[in-house]
Amino acid sequence: TLFAAAGLGGEARIVGGAVRDWLAGRAVGDIDMAVNLPIQLIADRLRQIQHIKVINTGLAHGTVTVVDAAQSIELTQTRSDVATDGRHAVVEFQDDWAEDAARRDFTINALYLDAGGRLFDPLGGQADLAAQRLRFVGRATDRVQEDALRMLRYCRFSIDYNGAQYDKQAVEALRGFASLAAGLSGER
């Protein structure tokens, strides 16, 4: 793996949409990976590999993009949210995969695939995907208040996944916090 080539320990897992789409039998687009090592260490080591470009796309949030001739992959250090402002989070880096999953928006996006092809699904996202059920991770009201963009993502995913079963708690949260959408940028 790339980590072994860079002399890194730790673990990198594909996470989110790529895993979700693969499980759903859809074409996989962007690849995001969660990593349980300090992102600056990873970036520094990967920069030493010929033909690899590392872009600091969001170091404060633990994210870099790794680009080679074939593809680009976004790497983000495992983390938890310690504060939010309705759109952006203050994060704390850690190496607990379950905590990283708990900060994600939907159970179907809290799916991880390791280098051995093993699925890590701490929140039941695979079952939700199979049942075409769209659920927020934890309380829907908390997820929406943390990031208002999640309301739009809920609508998008419910359409993308063939009219996924509506979650009553989610619909109530969307109704209750609809005014937060006014604070989102126009391109969203």
Task: Describe the function of each predicted region.
Residues 1-188:
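Catalytic cores of the polymerase beta-like nucleotidyltransferase superfamily
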